[in-house]
Amino acid sequence: IHQEVIPAIGCTEPVAVALAAAKAAEVLGHRPEKIEVLLSANILKNAMGVGIPGTGMVGLPIAVALGTLIGKSAYGLEVLRDLTPEALAEGKQVIEDKRIHIALKDNVDKLYIEVICSAGDETSRVIICHEHTNVVYVEKNGVVLTDRRKEGVSCDASGDEDELRLSFSTVYEFAMEMPLDEIRFILETADLNRKAAEASLKGNFGHTVSKTVSGVYGRKYMGDSAYTHMLAMTAAACDARMDGAMIPVMSNSGSGNQGIAATLPVLSFAEDIECTEELLIRALMLSHLMVIYIKQSLGRLSALCG
């Protein structure tokens, strides 16, 4: 849970690319003059049409540019949280100067990101694969600094999924039987994702599904029930993050939408039936672990975003 359920700002595919770009720029030690980005088909597809937090723009070029300009790899999936208007203007200039080249890389893991930065005679190269924050290879000027591929971390199309194999019974027993104080931390997911939903309702993000569902026509045709409450709260948080709002959410298995879907329907229903805190904690833990369990079979990157 601690490994898979972490905060993220923005859609995790372009943010993961920004993370690789930030790491490559840090290793280079200079502002890159050229940036080459090689991506798996799923990363390329999932990142093409979503909003980048705080920019009002969509797609990979601005994510890559900002990653090299203001990104800090230590921030993980919150790599772009130091964005300023000045940095955004610089990022737009990098795109206009055509310093970024993005291409498809075949026969690699579904989640594969490679960024090569250069300035003068110096170069750096960073590879993320299998997981959104999993840096497996770092190189500077032809010298390998890190190569976790030698440790059995595969980045080809046949790479194995997580070594830990969960079962339904294991997940259920853990959620139902663990001492409450040891799993109470899962309430952080409810707190963060609820704030994202509430912030979304103060603006007009994405398709404004939440406002439609809870508005006059939504209530007329869909009713006012526990189901519509769950739908409205969940859609609010998803709309905001997919539209590029600077709102952090708690992700699951590298997906903000999966983290939201594992959290907010449970929280909304718990509030509707006024259940105990213990029941909410155990339900949230079961929900998040079930997502991780299911992703073992589906793979970390699905055909659709989230």
What are these regions (language model features)?
Residues I1-P14, L19, K92-E96:
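Short, Gly/Pro- and small/polar-rich lid/capping loops
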Residues A18-C117:
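Early transmembrane hairpin of solute transport permeases
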Residues A25, F269-R282, I292-G306:
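Hydrophobic alpha-helical bundle architecture
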Residues G29-I43, S225-G244, T276-K295:
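Acidic-glycine-rich active-site phosphate/pyrophosphate-binding loop
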Residues E96-G244:
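Signature of multi-pass transmembrane helix bundles
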